[in-house]
């Protein structure tokens, strides 16, 4: 209440002083009264409170950004409502735009090699024939190679070569590799769609399921091989055991025969010795 009524009280005091004091002093006093510390204490407190409230609202509206010291961890500060990206292994290489053309070309060759090889042969033949025709019409590739800044020894090979149109066509063929791969990928995609539409090519399962099926097949094959190996080993063990038992029986029989013969010989020797003693 004192802070709210302080300006009014000061104005009354100034009016009373203006009546009793000279006019010049009364004109200067309001400035001092207006700049009194109590008046500014009230307004400054209100302004500071409003400024703090405004800064708090601005901080709430500013989106959460990662600090500079944690560069590369932007994913930790994003909202949890973002869709979970699909596994790259499940994406068809013909539809995967997140990788380069050369990686897509390799993956497509691994998955659709039977379709891609004929398409690539046809497109490469068309490309090389077009470049050979352009070379016959007088297209000179040397200024372009010098313009893009290739080494002099490479440019010199093409300039001083006796290969003629074929070498020029081959150089243009190699320079157009990204475009050739792109055309091959497009032709392969159209061919795959056509073959699937007419039932000549089945839709491949996702890579995860494909790998799981392959793992199951491999596991079954390994189990069968292990069972066959166990059976063979057990059969071999039985055969070996039978052979050993037969050998042992034969050895016992031979040993018994040898023992009988030895006992007979010993008995004969004893009889002869006893007969000689009696004769003496």
Curated annotation (Swiss-Prot):
This protein's GO CC annotations: membrane; mitochondrion
Keyword terms: Coiled coil, Membrane, Transmembrane, Transmembrane helix
PANTHER family: PROTEIN FAM210A, PROTEIN FAM210B, MITOCHONDRIAL
Source organism of this protein record: Danio rerio (Zebrafish)
Upper taxonomic lineage: Eukaryota, Metazoa, Chordata, Craniata, Vertebrata
Membrane topology, record value: Single-pass membrane protein
Protein name (database record): Uncharacterized protein C18orf19 homolog B
Membrane-spanning segments: 115-135
Stored Pfam families: FAM210A-B_dom (PF06916)
């Amino acid at each position: 209440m004192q802070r709210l009524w302080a300006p009014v009280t000061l104005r009354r005091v100034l009016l009373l002083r203006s009546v009793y004091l000279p006019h010049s002093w009364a004109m200067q006093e309001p400035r001092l009264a207006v700049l009194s510390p109590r008046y500014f204490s009230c307004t400054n407190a209100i302004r500071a409170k409003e400024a703090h409230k405004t800064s708090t609202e601005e901080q709430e509206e500013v989106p959460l950004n990662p600090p500079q010291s944690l560069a590369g961890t932007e994913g930790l500060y994003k909202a949890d409502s973002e869709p979970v990206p699909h596994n790259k292994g499940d994406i068809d290489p013909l539809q995967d735009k997140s990788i380069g053309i050369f990686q897509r070309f390799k993956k497509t060759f691994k998955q659709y090699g039977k379709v891609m090889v004929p398409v690539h042969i046809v497109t490469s033949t068309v490309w090389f024939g077009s470049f050979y025709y352009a070379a016959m019409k007088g297209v000179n590739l040397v200024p372009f190679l010098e313009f893009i800044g290739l080494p002099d020894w490479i440019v010199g090979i093409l300039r001083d070569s006796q290969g003629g149109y074929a070498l020029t066509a081959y150089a243009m063929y190699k320079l157009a590799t990204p475009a050739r791969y792109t055309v091959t990928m497009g032709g392969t995609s159209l061919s795959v769609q056509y073959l699937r539409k007419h039932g000549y090519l089945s839709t491949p399962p996702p890579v995860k399921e494909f790998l799981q099926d392959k793992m199951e097949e491999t596991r079954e094959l390994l189990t069968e091989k292990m069972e066959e190996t166990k059976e063979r080993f057990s059969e071999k063990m039985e055969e070996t055991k039978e052979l050993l038992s037969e050998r042992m029986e034969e050895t016992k029989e031979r040993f018994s025969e040898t023992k009988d013969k030895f006992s007979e010989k010993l008995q004969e020797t004893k009889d002869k010795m006893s007969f000689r003693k009696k004769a003496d």
